[in-house]
A protein has these predicted regions:
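Active-site helical microenvironments for divalent-metal-assisted chemistry
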Residues: 1-195
Length: 195
């Protein structure tokens, strides 16, 4: 498994979490995080992003950003696994067995495609706000921040839809979470790719 975990994105995340553990006397369980990375890399192994990069790099980047705001092992693992139920053969049941029920429930809560039906981002955000799932809202927000960085590859019509959704749903979410720095970044990407 150690060779499987050897890459720049993985090392960057693990180094950051190790630093958090030492600097803030936190106890992020690095063994569990490594296991989650292994699962993300394994289950996303045949997937590529629109940029051509291996897909697993996206959830690692989301987890890296999440670690700026949350020092909880379950939250970081949820960020790493956030697309697995939706985009791979990994199931909620398998996640519960390998990690715990909380992580499995959180990954499921972030899954938009269920039973052939896709939930809109705004509906998911409203549900998570009503349930006071701040950590999951954070993951959802940072997922959008990482995804919007590559919308230049999308067709113009799809790009415009993503920008509008970001302006109407995710910038207000950043403000709701009291993360003005994220709102500013999202707005800059929207402006950059608007034309």
């Amino acid at each position: 498994m150690l060779a499987f975990l050897n890459c720049e994105h993985i090392n960057k995340l693990l180094d950051k979490l190790d630093l958090i553990n030492h600097s803030f006397d936190k106890r992020i369980n690095l063994d569990k995080v490594k296991k989650a990375i292994f699962y993300a890399k394994k289950y996303h192994s045949n997937q590529k992003r629109d940029t051509g990069e291996p897909y697993y790099m996206h959830p690692l980047e989301v987890a890296l950003m999440v670690a700026d705001y949350s020092f909880k092992t379950d939250t970081i693992i949820t960020a790493i696994l956030h697309d697995t139920i939706e985009d791979t053969t990994l199931t909620k049941e398998k996640i519960a067995i390998e990690f715990n029920d909380n992580i499995a429930e959180q990954v499921l809560a972030l899954t938009r495609n269920r039973g052939g039906k896709k939930t809109s981002s705004i509906k998911m955000i409203k549900t998570l706000v009503n349930q006071d799932k701040v950590e999951l809202l954070l993951i959802k927000l940072l997922d959008r921040l990482d995804n919007i960085k590559t919308i230049f590859i999308k067709p113009v019509k799809r790009r415009q839809e993503i920008i509008l959704e970001t302006q109407q749903e995710f910038i207000p979410l950043a403000e709701y979470l009291k993360l003005p720095e994220i709102a500013i970044k999202l707005n800059k990407y929207c402006e950059r790719y608007a034309t």
